[in-house]
Amino acid sequence: MIGRLRGNLLEKQPPELLIEVSGIGYEVQMPMSCFYELPEVGSEAIIYTHYVVREDAQLLYGFNTKNERALFREVIKANGVGPKLGLAILSGMTAAQFVQSVEREDISTLVKLPGVGKKTAERLVVEMKDRLKGWGAGDLFTPATDAAPMDDGSEFITSPQSAVDEAVSALIALGYKPQQASKTVSQVAKPDMTSEVLIRESLKSMI
């Protein structure tokens, strides 16, 4: 079981990163709500991980805190929710927003997430509402999306079009349909936006 990685952040290609620990590079998938908080490429990073073994792959999912990882593990306990959908859920909204939506039984908000239909949203509420009682959203998770610091984008962008393409690819990787991803990014795009900011603004606009 790989539970924690500490090393040099080599690449950031949302929603995936590459971190080098003792000469070994680990590919880690991370919810965008956590990805925004990563340091710049070349810096040291500490990531708490959830390790998944499948017949065809071994996957690592990463988080900035143990509590974010704990929430992810609670999410994937729900019927019909695997790690990929869990990643999309915690990318489409912050951890605090997700907890609030479940507590309020806000099905209409949950179904806006990629891969979450009405039945899945209802299962999330029924199965998780009691388990999430006492989870203080204010001090358990990384800052809400609005408060996330903007990266200078130096490792993300070489031109406006490359930022748009990368943002669209990231949304598709999270489960959004290509047409929806492309349309949403185009609607929020402004000159000189980095791909990270484009992804964040696109996700905000869809919830």
UniProtKB/Swiss-Prot annotation:
Residues 1-64 are annotated as: Domain I. Keywords: Cytoplasm, DNA damage, DNA recombination, DNA repair, DNA-binding. SMART domains: HhH1 (SM00278). Residues 65-143 are annotated as: Domain II. InterPro entries: DNA_helicase_Holl-junc_RuvA_I (IPR013849), Hlx-hairpin-Hlx_DNA-bd_motif (IPR003583), NA-bd_OB-fold (IPR012340), RuvA (IPR000085), RuvA_2-like (IPR010994), RuvA_C (IPR011114), RuvA_C_sf (IPR036267). GO terms for biological process: DNA recombination; DNA repair. Gene3D superfamilies: 5' to 3' exonuclease, C-terminal subdomain, DNA helicase RuvA subunit, C-terminal domain, Nucleic acid-binding proteins. Has three domains with a flexible linker between the domains II and III and assumes an 'L' shape. Domain III is highly mobile and contacts RuvB. Belongs to the RuvA family. The RuvA-RuvB-RuvC complex processes Holliday junction (HJ) DNA during genetic recombination and DNA repair, while the RuvA-RuvB complex plays an important role in the rescue of blocked DNA replication forks via replication fork reversal (RFR). RuvA specifically binds to HJ cruciform DNA, conferring on it an open structure. The RuvB hexamer acts as an ATP-dependent pump, pulling dsDNA into and through the RuvAB complex. HJ branch migration allows RuvC to scan DNA until it finds its consensus sequence, where it cleaves and resolves the cruciform DNA. Homotetramer. Forms an RuvA(8)-RuvB(12)-Holliday junction (HJ) complex. HJ DNA is sandwiched between 2 RuvA tetramers; dsDNA enters through RuvA and exits via RuvB. An RuvB hexamer assembles on each DNA strand where it exits the tetramer. Each RuvB hexamer is contacted by two RuvA subunits (via domain III) on 2 adjacent RuvB subunits; this complex drives branch migration. In the full resolvosome a probable DNA-RuvA(4)-RuvB(12)-RuvC(2) complex forms which resolves the HJ. This is Holliday junction branch migration complex subunit RuvA.
